[in-house]
């Protein structure tokens, strides 16, 4: 597993969120207040229980801390969101959110992403009328490819970085996964590694001809049959591909920060395997004399 310095922070944040959610955001009763309550008969207990409000429902998705994005003005384009790499380098991860999705979902895996490289999150090019501030994606793959390349150039110019626009790890979720599939179909040389989260339809093998590695993932509580079938199609065709199952989560959820970081770390390890071990050179054997 890649560097796990993020593990302590993610664990603490996840535990705090779970405790907070379990108590409905309220402070738990103290031991003194609990012990001071007077005993009552079973009949009174039953009446009190019947009239008491129901316990607060746990959230469907475990809340995550919004990423501490740097937001860059992209001129005529929508502002782009940037997270730096843990260690400066050329690797860049581009995130494409889902249909009218929350770009802050990246908060579920910030440290793991930072160990991969800098992260750039774009917003869809079409506004969602019923969800102000949310966006969806058109089917213009050429325009999206150009937006990604401009965003990388802008980040490089702003920070004097040297992110490689021809070696992008592309991460699309739900509708963003569809757009990622379209991008690698036409511009695979720029996107050699692709992560497809919760793709809503079966992947087409012919769209991945020049991709080096494909990771597909879905939640245990959603229908993953087509995701698994698509990954199996790719494997059968000889691609480096794998399906990852996120336990106990539904569509649109990464399971919180601890689970999200663990999952993305494993996925990125798969996409970028360690270099092969080079065996030390052996001494050449002495030449054999040929009988005269």
Regions found by a protein language model. Give the residues of each.
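Short beta-strand/loop motif that positions the catalytic acidic residue
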Residues: 214-218
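Alpha/beta-hydrolase fold nucleophile elbow
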Residues: 161-173
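C-terminal catalytic histidine-bearing segment of alpha/beta-hydrolase fold enzymes
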Residues: 224-292
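Serine-hydrolase catalytic machinery in alpha/beta-hydrolase-like enzymes
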Residues: 54-84, 90-163
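A domain-start/cap signature at the N-terminus of enzymes
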Residues: 18-92, 117, 232, 279-283, ...
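Gly/Ala-rich beta-loop-alpha elbow adjacent to hydrolase catalytic centers
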Residues: 172-176, 180
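A conserved short beta-strand
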Residues: 189-201
């Amino acid at each position: 597993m890649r560097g796990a310095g993020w593990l302590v922070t993610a664990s603490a944040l996840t535990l705090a969120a779970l405790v907070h959610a379990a108590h409905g955001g309220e402070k738990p009763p103290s031991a003194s207040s609990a012990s001071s309550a007077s005993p009552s008969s079973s009949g009174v207990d039953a009446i009190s229980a019947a009239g008491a409000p129901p316990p607060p429902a746990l959230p469907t998705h475990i809340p995550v801390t919004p990423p501490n994005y740097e937001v860059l003005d992209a001129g005529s384009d929508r502002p782009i969101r940037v997270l730096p790499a843990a260690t400066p380098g050329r690797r860049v991860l581009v995130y494409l959110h889902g249909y009218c999705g929350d770009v802050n979902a990246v908060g579920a895996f910030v440290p793991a992403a930072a160990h991969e490289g800098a992260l750039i999150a774009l917003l869809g090019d079409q506004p969602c009328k019923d969800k102000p501030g949310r966006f969806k994606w058109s089917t213009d793959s050429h325009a999206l490819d150009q937006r990604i390349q401009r965003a990388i150039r802008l980040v490089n110019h702003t920070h004097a970085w040297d992110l490689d626009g021809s070696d992008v790890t592309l991460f699309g979720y739900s509708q963003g996964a569809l757009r990622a599939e379209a991008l690698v179909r036409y511009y695979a040389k720029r996107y050699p590694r692709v992560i497809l989260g919760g793709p809503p339809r079966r992947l087409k093998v012919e769209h991945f001809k020049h991709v080096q590695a494909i990771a597909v993932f879905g939640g245990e509580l959603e229908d993953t049959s087509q995701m698994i079938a698509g990954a199996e199609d790719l494997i059968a065709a000889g691609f480096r591909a794998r399906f990852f199952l996120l336990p106990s989560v539904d569509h649109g959820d990464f399971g919180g920060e601890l689970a999200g970081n663990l999952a993305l770390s494993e996925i990125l390890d798969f996409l970028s395997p360690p270099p092969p071990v080079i065996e030390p050179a052996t001494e050449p054997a002495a030449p054999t004399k040929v009988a005269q």
